[in-house]
Regions:
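Conserved P-loop NTPase motor core
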Residues: 1-561, 610-611, 627-628, 632, ...
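Generic detector of ordered secondary-structure context
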Residues: 22, 58, 278, 325, ...
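Positions in alpha-helical segments
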Residues: 24-28, 596, 757, 817
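Active-site-adjacent structural elements in folded domains
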Residues: 107, 414, 804-806, 814
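Glycine-centered loop/turn positions within well-structured domains
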Residues: 216, 428, 723, 817, ...
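Extended, charged helical/alpha-beta scaffold domains that provide interaction surfaces
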Residues: 303-310, 316-323, 525-526, 533, ...
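Hydrophobic, well-ordered secondary-structure elements that form the walls
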Residues: 430, 478, 723, 759, ...
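Short Cys/His-rich zinc-binding micro-motifs
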Residues: 809-828, 832
Length: 834
């Protein structure tokens, strides 16, 4: 009793019940309204919101409106428990509603209410079949009420996606939402952005998306490209240089071209100006070639082993197989040593579902099974799980688990149970964990001539069709545990008298939640049903947690006459299994929490860069942004040669001029007389003023729109080039720090510290290059923005049910090249097999 009084979920349940009672009280009044009067409620509510009222002020009336509209437009009236579910969702919580309780209809109430704000509502499903189905069916209701509905699918053009997102309500998959967010932060014109601000999302099967897929990153990677020729050309060029063509700092491992070196580069590559905007990428190749040839040393920093460059660990001297230098340096070394130059693929944008969905102003979710993960939902997403009561009592029979010594005996028993119940005509759904198990059981049923369907989740349309018929008399369906989520199994004629749907589990899953989902396929809306799990000591879960102990106990119950097994059916075994599942769930939660801690580092960095990118796209004039970057650069330049609070010496002035003259400023642009005998702060101010003079000079010479576009072109290209390299570098760092635990170091702390240093370097590089290019580049009349990442491919870091679609057609990879889909497999073992 006292637990209930202090339980947040219990309090929320009581709160939403009061709201449902208020909605119920309005039912008769709203039935009396004409269609026109009911439809007029939508503009009426919008006007009230514009006049300062909140969504909570109109919640009860809006729910009552949508409920009555559903009756008229869909022929379905939400029950009280569905109104309770909608109220829980509006509170930014998870409504746990059993299978068959009408989650889709429940969502319409809260979606309608929140769509009235005009800020957009996203309804999120796990696949495009469900998104299309729900948008089509529920769209009838929303359109009746005067709201617009969009469907965001993978195949749509950017224009079609933008139209879908601009609707009051948008149906989409979780994957497509995440990819669109990433792509929006790679565009080069603000008009190309498709998403609006992330306002409110209702996530169907929320446990699947926010728990099961939490560790799956969404990745947009640059497709495999053959850049060997560019690396070879850059290598050939730097090998032709003489000592006076470059300045080298062995201690800092830093090298730059001198004025003579830059002149040679322009002649070698036939360029007018090496520091022109369009040459950012080429300069990157040259810089890597310089480092490879004059900073990196064979048999010190790396060795050649079996025709490949292998890094030498600077601390242990051991070869670091499987590791690569990032940002193209490894390929530059391959060019230097004339070994095979491997194609580059790089991660150019990435985000996890954990971080994506936490960006919504408000987040809510629905599922039949969330209570077991309530702590995780609360701690990571700040969402409570509200258990919504069923409309009718659950009368399903959940039998005690039975356990066998061997897997063979278990499957024989399952086949016997299926055969016996099939003879009576009772429909049977058999849940398996793997396709392999499904095929094994299918083989056994074929031998017994029992007709059945097997689902492998490869075709959503076919899957939904089979599941929808799985409750008919005589149906036998074998499916993976997750198959058919989102589609109800309705009982056929005469099935209630046979005991309803029989669900048999072939083994226990690692997660109690998945087992509960399988059970929940039976006994919907007060229907009868029966569920039972069959286990053996050879099951994976049992092997991991003390199967030997069970084998000893089971040895006493083997039939002594014929040696056959007698299954054990004791509740103690079920409790043992549940205990094992809790341990695994705890481990998985810890793992997801750890992933989030790593992701937090990149999340903060991504927010800064994406924020800066948006400023570039949306500000009319970015001169203040550029000026701020130039100030930081000038301060750093002075600080690199002297104490900025002291007076500059002749020697320091000489060093400074060597660094800036011809590199950060046009040759001879800095007057030595203006910096001698000045304090460091004054020197930095002078350099900044010269930057401003160059800006002003460009502004006077060209029309204002051309000048503004010039700044945006340079800054976008510099930011994107370095950010994409940084993403790739952070990915490699994450792999590298895993080895730190062996050296008694905290890998997370190492990742945080090194990641912070890398980001500081990234910011400095962006500021430095922006200053260099803007000061030295010539403005052209036909300036065009150009996307840095080309031939990109979106992947979710896991095998998908449908073929991934590259954004642009690319060169066909070789059989042993990495597959461009981003799976990490060789092409011949992935998409090359199709």
């Amino acid at each position: 009793m006292f637990k209930g009084l202090f339980d947040a979920g219990y309090k929320e349940l009581k709160r939403v019940e009061k709201i449902a009672d208020k909605v119920d009280a309005l039912a008769e009044d709203y039935k009396k309204l004409t269609d026109e009067e009911l439809k007029a409620k939508t503009p009426y509510f919008k006007e009230r919101l514009q006049n300062g009222e909140t969504l909570e002020d109109i919640e009860v009336e809006a729910f009552a409106t949508c409920r009555e509209a559903a009756t008229r437009a869909l022929g379905m009236t939400p029950f009280k428990v569905q109104i309770m579910g909608a109220a829980a969702l509006h509170g930014g919580n998870i409504a746990e509603m059993k299978t068959g309780e009408g989650k889709t209809l429940t969502s319409t109430l809260v979606v309608y209410l929140n769509a009235l704000s005009g800020k957009g509502v996203h309804v999120v499903t796990v696949n495009e079949y469900l998104a299309t189905r729900d948008a089509t069916e529920m769209g009838v209701l929303y359109n009746w009420l005067g709201l617009t509905v969009g469907l965001n699918l993978r195949e749509l053009t950017p224009e079609e996606k933008r139209a879908a997102y601009n609707c009051d309500i948008t149906y989409s998959t979780n994957n497509e939402l995440g990819f669109d967010y990433l792509r929006d932060h790679m565009v080069i014109y603000k008009e190309q952005i498709v998403q609006r601000e992330l306002n409110f999302a209702v996530v169907d099967e929320v446990d699947s998306i926010l728990i099961d897929e939490a560790r799956t990153p969404l990745i947009i990677s640059g497709a495999a490209k053959n850049t060997a020729g560019t690396y070879q050309n850059a290598d050939m060029f730097v090998k032709s240089l003489k000592a006076e063509d470059y300045d080298i700092d062995e201690k800092a491992k830093h090298i730059v071209l001198t004025e003579s070196g830059m002149g040679k580069a322009e002649r070698f590559f036939n360029l007018d100006n090496l520091y022109d905007v369009k040459n950012v990428t080429l300069l990157h190749y040259i810089q890597n070639a310089l480092r490879a040839n004059y900073i990196m040393h064979k048999d010190v920093d790396y060795v050649i082993h079996d025709g490949a460059i292998i890094i030498v660990d600077p601390f242990t001297g051991r070869l670091m197989f499987g590791r690569q230098y990032s940002e193209g340096l490894h390929q530059a070394l391959e060019a230097k040593e004339h070994v095979e130059i491997k194609k580059e693929t790089k991660t150019v944008a990435t985000i996890t579902f954990q971080n994506y969905f936490r960006m919504y102003h408000k987040l809510a979710g629905m599922t039949g099974t969330a209570k077991t993960e309530e702590d995780e939902f609360r701690n990571i997403y700040n969402m409570y799980v509200v258990e919504i009561p069923t409309n009718k009592p659950v009368i399903r029979i959940d039998a005690t688990d039975v356990i066998f010594m061997t897997m063979k005996a278990k499957f024989d028993a399952i086949a016997n149970e299926i055969e016996e119940r099939h003879k009576k005509g009772q429909p049977i759904l058999v849940g398996t964990i793997s396709i392999e198990t499904s095929e094994l059981l299918s083989h056994l049923l074929n031998k017994r001539h029992i007709p059945h369907n097997v689902l492998n989740a490869k075709q959503h349309e076919r899957e939904a069709e089979i599941i929808s018929h799985a409750g008919e008399k005589g149906a036998v369906t074998i499916a993976t545990n997750m198959a058919g989520r989102g589609t109800d199994i309705k009982l056929g004629e005469g099935v209630v008298e046979l005991g309803g749907l029989c669900v048999l589990g072939t083994e226990r899953h690692e997660s109690r939640r998945i087992d509960n989902q399988l059970r929940g396929r039976s006994g919907r809306q007060g229907d009868p049903g029966y569920t039972k799990f069959f286990l053996s000591t050879e099951d994976d879960l049992m092997k991991r947690f003390g199967s030997e102990r069970f084998k000893t106990l089971l040895g006493f119950v083997v039939n002594q006459k014929d040696g056959s097994e007698v299954p054990l059916e004791y509740k103690m075994f079920s409790k043992f299994v549940e205990s094992a599942q809790k341990k695994i769930e705890g481990n998985n939660y810890d793992s997801r929490e750890q992933v989030l801690k790593y992701d937090e580092v990149l999340r903060k960095q991504r927010e800064i860069i994406y924020g800066q990118r948006n400023d570039i796209l949306f500000y009319d004039d970015i001169t203040p942004i550029i000026t701020k970057m130039m100030k930081s650069t000038c301060d750093r330049l002075v600080h690199s040669v002297m104490d900025i609070n002291k007076v500059i010496t002749v020697e320091d002035a000489k060093k400074l001029l060597e660094i800036v003259d011809g590199k950060y400023f046009p040759l001879g642009y800095i007057d030595p007389e203006q910096i001698l005998n000045k304090k460091g702060t004054e020197v930095a101010e002078y350099l900044l003023q010269r930057c401003k003079d160059l800006l002003e000079d460009k502004k006077e010479k060209f029309p204002e729109p051309v000048y503004k576009e010039f700044l945006k072109v340079i800054l976008l290209r510099v930011v994107d080039t370095y950010w994409m390299d940084h993403i790739d570098s952070m990915s490699e760092l994450r792999q590298a720090v895993r080895l730190q635990s062996y050296a008694q170091k905290n890998p997370l702390r190492e990742y945080q510290e090194i990641g912070f240093e890398k980001f500081e370097t990234l910011v400095c590089n962006i500021e430095d290059d922006a200053t260099k290019f803007i000061n030295r580049a010539q403005i052209q009349d036909n300036l065009q923005r150009e996307q840095v990442a080309k031939n990109t491919v979106a992947s979710s870091g896991k095998e998908e049910n449908t073929k991934r679609k590259p954004v642009k057609k690319e060169e066909k990879p070789g059989p042993n090249d990495p597959c461009p889909c981003g799976s990490g497999l060789k092409y011949k073992k992935c998409c090359g097999r199709k």
